[in-house]
């Protein structure tokens, strides 16, 4: 029987491992919302299938699906992908799934953050969100893992860790008034240190331009390994992303990580700019949530890739850059397999490959 614990991971000797550490599984959630995923979510579902198949080359995949969509998902997903019935409000498993922590004795536990659909009523992306807020605990229950209910609102995509004491985030997101308005920056840092056993938080000012998540860090950077960061870069000084990336670089170059290392930066080219077409916008049902407007700029980023057991699964977003990014990733991760998946449908929904996946560490 699993328990929701009243202690803290730091108190119990647990830490959050980095994404490049060994994993036992990747969890995903099936896209279904017709007010976010165009044409009845069918194009997005086809893309999620391709992402799951790519991941499954090196890591088992579990896809959670509603009762209504279970048969459909089971038919279109390969038999080696586990399909599990679970209620959700949307399909951003990075944000709604548990952030796992591990100890030195082969044990793991989940961290269950409070979730409010990226800003609750008025500023959030959808309502209600109670099913999504329950997903992390359900995942832990299913896997037989104890969990901690963290005392703050946080999405998994708003943090990156290096596994050696350093956490990266953005001021834009974690200090946004729609998340934890009663907490100061220092108080949020204290919670992160106790909950994930990290020693240092590196605050990047902003996330990617026009990112509806209020600037999730996983759409701007990725931790390559301790002391090394892949950063979305824009050379066009007239583009709003230019200053955002420049400010991020300035912070990273002046900071040291928890171990005192200077941070090495690898520039990832920015795709596009990419914009939503009239056909793409018109295929989405109207609701009170996030509106899709023809001509609106999409928050496309190659940093939104997944590392899973010496395998990089990255989004194909722009033919002008896709191959160059593949070569750069192969250089950054020697001896890793690099797989690109056409990911525009995920981008149209507001995220990308990292956003729709959540790793379970191997212990």
Swiss-Prot record:
It catalyses: agmatine + H2O = N-carbamoylputrescine + NH4(+). Keywords: Hydrolase. Residues 1-10 have a biased composition (Polar residues). Residues 1-20 are annotated as: Disordered. This is Putative agmatine deiminase. The keyword Hydrolase applies. InterPro entries: Agmatine_deiminase (IPR017754), Peptidyl-Arg-deiminase_porph (IPR007466). It is an enzyme of class 3 (hydrolase). GO terms for molecular function: agmatine deiminase activity; protein-arginine deiminase activity. Belongs to the agmatine deiminase family. GO terms for biological process: putrescine biosynthetic process. The active site is at residue 355. Its EC number is 3.5.3.12. It comes from Photobacterium profundum (strain SS9). The keyword Hydrolase applies. SUPFAM superfamilies: Pentein (SSF55909).
């Amino acid at each position: 029987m699993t328990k929701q614990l009243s202690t803290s991971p730091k108190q119990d000797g647990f830490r959050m491992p980095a994404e490049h550490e060994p994993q036992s599984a990747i969890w995903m959630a099936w896209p279904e919302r017709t007010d976010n995923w165009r044409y009845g979510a069918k194009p997005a579902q086809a893309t999620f299938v391709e992402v799951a198949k790519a991941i499954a080359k090196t890591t088992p995949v579990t896809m959670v699906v509603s009762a209504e969509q279970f048969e459909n998902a089971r038919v279109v997903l390969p038999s080696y992908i586990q399909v599990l019935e679970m209620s959700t409000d949307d399909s951003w498993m990075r944000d709604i799934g548990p952030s796992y922590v591990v100890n030195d004795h082969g044990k793991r536990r989940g961290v269950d953050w409070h979730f409010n659909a990226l800003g609750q009523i008025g500023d959030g992306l959808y309502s209600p969100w109670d099913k999504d807020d329950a997903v992390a605990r359900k995942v832990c229950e299913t896997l037989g893992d104890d969990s901690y209910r963290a005392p703050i609102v946080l999405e998994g995509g708003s943090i990156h860790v290096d596994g050696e004491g350093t956490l990266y985030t953005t001021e834009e997101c974690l200090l946004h008034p729609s998340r934890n308005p009663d907490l100061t920056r220092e108080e949020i840092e204290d919670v992160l240190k106790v909950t994930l056993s990290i020693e240092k938080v590196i605050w990047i000012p902003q996330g990617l331009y026009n990112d509806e998540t209020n600037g999730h860090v996983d759409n701007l950077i990725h931790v390559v390994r301790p002391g090394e960061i892949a950063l979305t870069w824009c050379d066009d000084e007239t583009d709003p992303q230019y200053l955002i990336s420049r400010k991020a670089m300035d912070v990273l170059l002046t900071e040291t990580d928890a171990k005192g290392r200077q941070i090495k930066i690898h520039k990832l080219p920015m795709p596009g700019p990419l914009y939503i077409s009239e056909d793409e916008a018109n295929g989405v049902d109207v609701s009170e949530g996030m509106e899709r407007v023809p001509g609106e700029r999409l928050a496309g980023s190659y940093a939104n890739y997944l590392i899973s057991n010496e395998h990089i699964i990255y989004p194909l977003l722009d033919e002008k850059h896709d191959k160059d990014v593949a070569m750069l990733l192969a250089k950054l991760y020697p001896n890793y397999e690099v797989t690109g998946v056409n990911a525009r449908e995920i981008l149209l929904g507001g995220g990308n490959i990292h956003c729709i996946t959540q790793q379970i560490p191997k212990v």
